[in-house]
């Protein structure tokens, strides 16, 4: 009773309210201290800007394609490929997803990939005269539509990071069409087959994320990069040895998983 008289109910309530205010201020201070600093936010956003530059590179590649400067077009697409290869590790290093939660790097990456991997190469395939004239526009439309559906497919990657089906790598397909320069009928049949294979559930090797035999894959990718640069510098006028090596690497990327599974079935 003495304590109750000393500390009246009104005063006790005031003490409680004051305590709650102090706790809330302390929590706000702690949350503020956990917020990313402006420099961190700027660095994280710069990664998104870097990724978006891939779309600008696609425009430059398209301008070269319209002029029928095919080797220059592929060189720009190669720059876009480098951006696509390194922006992800940088984003994970800087924790961009949490530092800049209002910007979706995944969506941005899909947008850039579609114009660099699909749209510009599709134009090159259709406009280059490599296909039968009657089939070229139809196959161009098929490339765009099936690739858009593939990009929206949540099953596009298997659990072991292999791609399911032909992974809409039309920049690579276009490169090989220019390299091989087959008769229009053969090239038309190849493009039609790749369109169909987009939805066939075979596994295509992801050059970076598949762990199995990564050392071999990365070595082959390095060789492929050197030979591809040489091919573009020569405007696709290379000898059969270079062509054979480039085709062998492409076949390994496309069918190594099926080959390994087949070999293991006899073990």
Swiss-Prot record:
Keyword Cell inner membrane appears in the UniProt entry: yes
Topological domain spans for side Periplasmic: 64-69, 124, 184, 237-239
Annotated S-S bridges: none
Function: Condenses choline with CDP-diglyceride to produce phosphatidylcholine and CMP.
Annotated source species: Bradyrhizobium diazoefficiens (strain JCM 10833 / BCRC 13528 / IAM 13628 / NBRC 14792 / USDA 110)
Family membership noted in the UniProt record: Belongs to the CDP-alcohol phosphatidyltransferase class-I family.
Protein name: Phosphatidylcholine synthase
Stretches that traverse the bilayer: 43-63, 70-90, 103-123, 125-145, 163-183, 185-205, 216-236, 240-260
Upper lineage: Bacteria, Pseudomonadati, Pseudomonadota, Alphaproteobacteria, Hyphomicrobiales
GO molecular function: phosphatidylcholine synthase activity
Cellular localisation: Cell inner membrane
Gene: pcs
CC cofactor: Mn(2+)
Swiss-Prot/TrEMBL catalytic activity: a CDP-1,2-diacyl-sn-glycerol + choline = a 1,2-diacyl-sn-glycero-3-phosphocholine + CMP + H(+)
């Amino acid at each position: 009773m003495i304590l109750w008289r000393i500390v009246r109910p009104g005063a006790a309530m005031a003490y409680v309210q004051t305590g709650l205010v102090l706790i809330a201020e302390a929590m706000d201070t702690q949350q503020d201290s956990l917020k990313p600093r402006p420099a961190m936010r700027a660095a994280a956003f710069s990664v998104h800007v870097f990724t978006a530059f891939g779309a600008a590179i696609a425009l430059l590649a398209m301008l070269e394609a319209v002029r029928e400067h095919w080797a220059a077009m592929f060189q720009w697409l190669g720059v876009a490929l480098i951006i696509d290869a390194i922006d992800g590790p940088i984003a994970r290093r800087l924790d961009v997803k949490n530092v800049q939660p209002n910007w979706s790097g995944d969506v941005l990456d899909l947008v850039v990939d579609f114009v660099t991997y699909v749209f510009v190469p599709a134009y090159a395939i259709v406009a280059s005269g490599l296909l039968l004239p009657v089939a070229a526009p139809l196959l161009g439309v098929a490339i765009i539509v099936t690739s858009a559906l593939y990009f929206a497919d949540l099953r596009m990657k298997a659990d072991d990071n292999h791609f399911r089906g032909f992974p809409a790598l039309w920049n690579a397909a276009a490169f090989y069409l220019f390299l091989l320069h087959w008769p229009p009928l053969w090239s038309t049949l190849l493009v039609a087959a790749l369109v169909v294979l987009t939805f066939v559930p075979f596994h295509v090797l992801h050059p970076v994320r598949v762990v199995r035999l990564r050392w071999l894959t990365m070595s082959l990718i390095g060789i492929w990069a050197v030979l591809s640069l040489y091919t573009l510098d020569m405007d696709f006028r290379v000898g059969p040895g270079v062509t054979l090596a480039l085709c062998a690497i492409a076949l390994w990327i496309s069918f190594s998983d099926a080959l390994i599974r087949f070999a293991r079935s006899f073990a």
